A protein has these predicted regions:
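Conserved alpha/beta-hydrolase
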Residues: 2-14
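Short alpha-helix in the alpha/beta-hydrolase fold that links the catalytic acid
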Residues: 216-226, 237
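Short beta-strand/loop motif that positions the catalytic acidic residue
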Residues: 200, 206-208, 212
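Catalytic active-site module of serine/aspartate enzymes centered on a nucleophile-bearing elbow/loop
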Residues: 232-321
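Alpha/beta-hydrolase active-site loop
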Residues: 16-40, 56
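Alpha/beta-hydrolase-fold enzymes
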Residues: 38, 42, 56, 60-169, ...
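Gly/Ala-rich beta-loop-alpha elbow adjacent to hydrolase catalytic centers
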Residues: 49-57
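Acidic catalytic loop of the alpha/beta-hydrolase fold
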Residues: 211-215, 240-241
């Protein structure tokens, strides 16, 4: 097995409304890497990022690469965009006037000072990316017919949104979705360092879901051109969450495998082989050589210096937006 450390995505309140993209990279992602190195006693660790978490993780590793550090033994990116050339329906919500409006209302340019993007607004935006399934279905069933929606773990996830600090959100919108600068070596400066994702030397495993409405799989495939080292692309069935959370024991869905990485996503798919079942087994086989020798599992979490604070999953996970 693998010793796993999970970083909670904190739901910020007004006291954190001024936090920037640099803050999230330096004081969240990079600090988490440092602490895992210290607790595990390892110079290199396997790293994984999901969606925007993957964008943050890749940015952090590029910052560290600029400082002469390569802390990742491997990098796994799940439904992550680094090249924002193909962002799907989200393009309808993001243009120059829309980003400017955010910058002067909740960003660093706001006369009232930075504010929060409310989680409810974020959740509504994502729901309207799939209105038939996530909006009108419940208008008819719940409002018109008085039916109670059945318990559903993915629906719970969809409703469990988070606030975001305005400056962080505005930087992300402008430099990724609007201007697509993250993929360009040396174009952006983060935490005082010129970014070059190609400087990350770790082997990369990129996963995308075929029916993903948030991160279109062809957009995720474009990230294969960003990295210069060894990389593997995996396409799974279903959507943004259901495609990722697909344990092998369930024997559900399928995935597509292709050892080659042609320039075109369509060409990759045309020559790919469909394999029944979960993609997890492929990833586990890929990850195993990067994990180092087997050791005895720790009996308790943390160390003398880094003591456990409370039982998992921790208070941040339970906070409501």
């Amino acid at each position: 097995g693998h010793r796993v450390f999970v970083v909670s995505w904190r739901n910020p309140d007004e006291s954190l409304a001024d936090k920037t993209w640099d803050d999230y990279i330096e004081h969240a992602a990079i600090r988490a890497i440092r602490e895992v190195q210290a607790i595990s006693g390892q110079d290199q660790i396997d790293t994984l990022g999901f969606c925007v978490g993957g964008t943050i993780l890749a940015t952090a590793l590029a910052v560290l690469a600029a400082r002469g550090e390569q802390p990742a033994a491997s990098l796994t990116l799940l439904t992550t965009l680094l090249d924002f050339s193909s962002t799907g329906v989200l393009d309808l919500f993001i243009d120059e006037p829309a980003v400017q409006l955010r910058e002067v209302t909740i960003g660093e340019q706001s006369p009232q000072g930075p504010g929060l993007l409310k989680g409810k607004e974020l959740a509504t935006t994502f729901s309207f990316l799939r209105p038939n399934d996530l909006v009108w279905n419940y208008v008819v069933g719940n409002y018109l017919k008085g039916e109670t929606p059945p318990p559903f773990d993915l629906l719970y996830w969809n409703g469990d949104s988070t606030n975001l600090p305005g400056p962080f959100y505005c930087w992300y919108l402008r430099h990724t979705y609007l201007q697509n600068e993250l993929k360009i070596p040396g174009k952006l400066t983060v935490c005082g360092e010129k970014l070059d994702l190609g400087a990350i030397k770790a082997p990369v495993y990129l996963y995308a879901s075929r029916e993903d409405h948030i991160v279109p799989w062809k957009g995720a495939y474009a990230s294969t051109r960003v990295f210069k080292g060894k990389k593997r692309f995996m396409l799974g069935a279903s959507g943004h969450i259901a495609g990722v959370i697909n344990p092998p024991a369930a024997k559900k869905r399928s995935h597509w495998v292709n050892d080659k990485l042609p320039a075109s996503a369509d060409e990759w798919f045309t020559t790919a082989k469909e394999v029944p079942g979960s993609w997890w087994t492929d990833w586990a086989a890929w990850l195993k050589p990067h994990g180092g020798p087997m050791i005895a599992a720790p009996k308790t979490p943390g160390t003398r210096k880094y003591k456990a604070i409370e039982a998992a999953p921790g208070r941040y996970v339970k906070a409501k937006a």
